[in-house]
């Protein structure tokens, strides 16, 4: 079944009202995109910001007369007679298959591969993690996750215990276990992340070595030889003392989820406990590493 879509240039003040109106006019879905590709890296807690220049795309069934919809839109005072819009035909596709075709095995470092379950493993002798893309948590495609995976691939995990602080999908925890860690503790504030980590550990056969906790449930004396935290700059600053006390003397630390321009400032929060290395960068993002004093 073919579709037709209406694209409208609007702003962050009127996007919600416009979305409601288009749904009333029979739109099947609404998508909001940044008209100028302006990134939002770290919104305020509870905030879901929109862009000043927002492109709204409304999808309709092909037999809907969009000329009628456009006439209704012209009556809205915040749009007026001369608002910018575009009508496009949408090819009918197997969207699930097309989505799956976009994901391929990815190699990190020398040993580590992340592979979707529907793809053939490129190197059976490598360290392979089976992980399917999800909506909320990391799958290795984001630069910060890639930076952490590359760092983990470089380590010797013999007789080492690890903390994955902000475990999300569990991708870093599972990677550490597949690379040889004896035990990993994953901590996250989101119970859905705990469930996702557990499921991914089970899929990769390492669930018996992974302990998962919400912050309030974690052991009070928890420490590890290696700690990786891929969260955001704000929490990394605020939680520096807590993170530091979880790393044993001589232990290794990796922090990511921060932008290049944030790296130096965040590193300063850790220098009293760690000998910090020079940051590593990928695209606009950075990773900090250090050794516990």
From Swiss-Prot:
Coiled coil: none annotated. S-adenosyl-L-methionine binds at residues 145, 166, 188, 230. InterPro entries: Ribosomal_L11_MeTrfase_PrmA (IPR050078), Ribosomal_PrmA_MeTrfase (IPR004498), SAM-dependent_MTases_sf (IPR029063). One of its GO terms (biological process) is methylation. It is found in: Cytoplasm. Its EC number is 2.1.1.-. Pfam families: PrmA. It comes from the Bacteria. Keywords: Cytoplasm, Methyltransferase, S-adenosyl-L-methionine, Transferase. CDD domains: AdoMet_MTases. The keyword Transferase applies. Methylates ribosomal protein L11. HAMAP family: Methyltr_PrmA. This is Ribosomal protein L11 methyltransferase. It comes from Shewanella sediminis (strain HAW-EB3).
